[in-house]
């Protein structure tokens, strides 16, 4: 700098770390969504969300969004209530103004039965149904490629259902946020 505030390495190697994703965590934003209280209880720095029973049709959204690129998030289903829950992605055309199922791709799951399905808010219907049940402790992964218009769900590291494809025009110009509903 102009004031001779220059830094030197005393030992070891200096590593330039621009664009390094380490220690950047996308957490839930308790200021987005509707009916956050009593619908959800946030803890662990907004990395843990517990659904109330009933959850009162509450939404929760991630605090970081994106318009292009590839993204992956994992959710641990620590426990199930009797409610039906949804985990997936929602695409916004601007500042969030509505909390509805339009512009979504969701994995729907419940405590009992084979009601698990992949839902599209772009078409207003189920893309895949009668999927195998989940268990408490399962890790649900969501991989999204915004540019190529794909979404793939995972359970405990294995693909769960078929990849959702052909969504590039639906995703274009919209901001992705990971979302939960219950």
Residue ranges and their predicted role:
Residues 1-182:
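PRY/SPRY (B30.2) beta-sandwich protein-interaction domains
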